[in-house]
Amino acid sequence: MPKTNSSAASTNANPSSLQQHTPMMQQYLKIKAEHPDILLFYRMGDFYELFFDDAKKAAELLDISLTARGKSGGNAIPMAGVPYHAVENYLARLVKMGQSVAIVEQVGDPATSKGPVERKVQRIVTPGTVSDEALLNDKQDSILAAVFCPTQKANQELIFGYATLDVTSGRFTLCELSGEEALAAELQRTNPVELLYPDDFAYSHLINQRKGLRRRPQWEFDLQTATNQLTSQFGTNELSGFGVQNHQVGICAAGCVMQYIKDTQRSALPHIDRIVLESHNDTVVMDAATRRNLELTFNLSGGIENTLASILDKTSTPMGSRLLQRWIHRPLTDVTVLKKRQRNIQGLMESPYTQLQSALKKIGDMQRVLARLALRSARPRDFARLRQAFALLPDIQHYLEHEISHTSESAQPSDLLHLAEKISQYPDFADLLERAVIEAPPVLIRDGGVIKEGYNEELDRLRELSKGATDYLEELELREKERTGIASLKVGYNRVHGYFIEVSRSQSDLVPVEYVRRQTLKNNERYIIPELKEHEDNVLSSQSRSLALEKRLYDELFDLLLPQLTQLMQSADALAELDVLTNLAERAESLDYHRPELCPQSGIHFSQGRHPVVEQVSDAPFIANPINVNPDRRMLVITGPNMGGKSTYMRQTALIVLMAYIGSYIPAQDAQIGPIDRIFTRIGASDDLASGRSTFMVEMTETANILNNATANSLVLMDEIGRGTSTYDGLSLAWACAEYLATKLQSFTLFATHYFELTGLADALPELANVHLDAVEHGESIRFMHAVQDGAANKSYGLQVAQLAGVPKLVVQAAKRKLHELETGDISKQGRQETSPVNTVYATEKVETQLDLLSQTSEAEDLLHSIQPDDLTPKQALDYLYQLKKLVR
């Protein structure tokens, strides 16, 4: 089974022998026994301490000191700790590593406690349940997921139940997936930060590389238990109102999620008020390999640079950024929805949308603020953000209702007006927060200073008592100096001893009899008098009552806002959607994207197609290329040199199609794109050492998935099939796969290969065409043209690419001789050279490496001699100019 990434449950102490420990350690061990699988942060004064195995693990993960405290069984008890004021930083690091932490706070009063101060677990922080701003990545969803697979009967289809919850937005979904590939794809799409699975889960190989794994008892996946959990949360008698009642395997997974979130949050969850059945019938399906190879939101190294999302995402709000990523990972097949998005984008492009972006930037992450409101964990600055958002909503609504509908002839007003209605306005809430919360509140309510003056008369009165303390103390000090004649007399205060009258020791014999000594210092004596004691009681009482009242008023803000939580969440969702649409309008205008036509007829056609990522990160001008596949031309066999652009051309086609199916404009012109149900890629491969699979096995597994699942409406990218085995095996497999895709499946396929024998398929199969990316040789160098042309390439230029890569010239020259032998048939059928073993390709080293320096010309000269100026387009001429600049550097 997979590791759970949790703290070891064992410690060096046996809870059954608690009596050998101090009372404090007994208390710790009892609490730890209730949370054996997670780290326990145990509050002691100004630190959170960890003991035993927790201390060892925390010291390693957080790079903090490991010390010792007391003994257990004759051995020192390992201990580590972090200061309470910096705990959020440490929690953020642990959550990022997939760890969970139980926070134990002191809840008793040390002054009245007999024995250790009472402590309780106040919150449990896990990767999938955190809502604190400091612990979250604001541009990525924080998904808690559960997977369940019932015991399979003979010949029964393999079904997985999969449920996800984003506690920071309340979005709760379930689905049922057929087979391992479907589950792998869904895990890749949703990328949960925490994954729950039953302790008898039989498919550990699908999840054991993930962080944040949590093994759960089987009873949490019981159907009746799960149903009860869900109906209890939603306040319903059954689940039929959500349309999920027939998806029992998915319900089992969702029930586990709900049980876990209740166990960890220990509070009401009013924003989780529904569950949505996710169907893949209305989406363009992509498997895990495709999502990875296309580098949608993460590149092949796991970073976020040079991905499709990094180019498309210039959103104004974090919630808009997260929604855009969900759109990218879930392209739709519903053309009605997609055309509506296109109309909205066009309407925004024809309006002064920068005003809208400025307003949205000030809105911030309203979704997550509202989630903290629902969990009653919102902080003072969250209320300040809500106040600012409420103040901006009227301007945004006015913009949607007037600026766009009056200036745009393209967008149907009802499209964006519907968003305006969902955004709504909350003038009462705006007024409430304006009156209640100060302009720049502190981070926490703990020490008060949040509620604005004038909001509550009693609070103002109590605060005045505290403020008046300074005037009174100054007056008392002057009065006592005059009365006693002691010039050094001062009135002061500290938190330990309270208020006091301080007199230098040399004048202490002058103090009146009613002065009662409170503290003796080296050079001074401190006293208290009845009048000052009475003032102290009044002030401290007023401060205590003021803070208690302020906290009560703060809690009342939750009570006043929460009844409208559902509508507020709908407003936040609408703002996120508006942000994405505005962002796509800006991207289309800034990056010269065009509106594609989504057609009912099969096929993919566009001109001047560009790779959305490569064109932005490349220094050289990007060479745009067309594509045309249709029912009469379903497969393109693509040949050409390595580095010639074959993979870029294939990927750009898939990305352009995907962008069209999220409703975006695309980096291509004259686009007509027909129905697409799936996108498959078989591009690149590496060993899967963890599963014991070779590169070739990975390649064949991905190929098998394509051949078993592709349809006539699928887009398939196949790159270098068969290269991981012998030449004849590889060629045979590539030939058979190409023929099967073209004739049996009839998928729209881009098939890149270096097996030039495959180009002969075009003579036998009318639905197959050859295209190539050309290159031009200049002496010893090569220049890649990157332009797609009809017909097959005449060679692969592998030796020239090897030379560019820095392979020693001696090796390249030897390879050229061997290539000549192979091409002229100087190798026997057995593959042995008809010469002495000593007569190798390096035998003529002395002759061949003797260079004629005088006869050599520069690469720049060779290139200039090869150019025919009258045949060049302006674009090609500019291209040559860039190439010449590189050569003369």
Swiss-Prot record:
Domain of life: Bacteria
Extent of Low complexity compositional bias: 1-17
Keyword line: ATP-binding, DNA damage, DNA repair, DNA-binding, Nucleotide-binding
Gene Ontology biological process terms, A to Z: mismatch repair
Annotated GO CC locations: cytosol
Gene Ontology MF annotations: ATP binding; ATP-dependent DNA damage sensor activity; damaged DNA binding; mismatched DNA binding
Keyword DNA damage: yes
Residues involved in ATP binding: G640, P641, N642, M643, G644, G645, K646, S647
Keyword field contains Flavoprotein: no
Regions that span the bilayer: none
Pfam family membership, one: MutS_II
Gene3D superfamilies membership: 1.10.1420.10, 6.10.140.430, DNA repair protein MutS, domain I (3.40.1170.10), MutS, connector domain (3.30.420.110), P-loop containing nucleotide triphosphate hydrolases (3.40.50.300)
Record region (Disordered): 1-20
SMART domains from the UniProt entry: MUTSac, MUTSd
Family: Belongs to the DNA mismatch repair MutS family.
Physiological role: This protein is involved in the repair of mismatches in DNA. It is possible that it carries out the mismatch recognition step. This protein has a weak ATPase activity.
PANTHER family hit by this protein: DNA MISMATCH REPAIR PROTEIN MSH1, MITOCHONDRIAL, DNA MISMATCH REPAIR PROTEIN MUTS FAMILY MEMBER
Name this protein carries in UniProt: DNA mismatch repair protein MutS
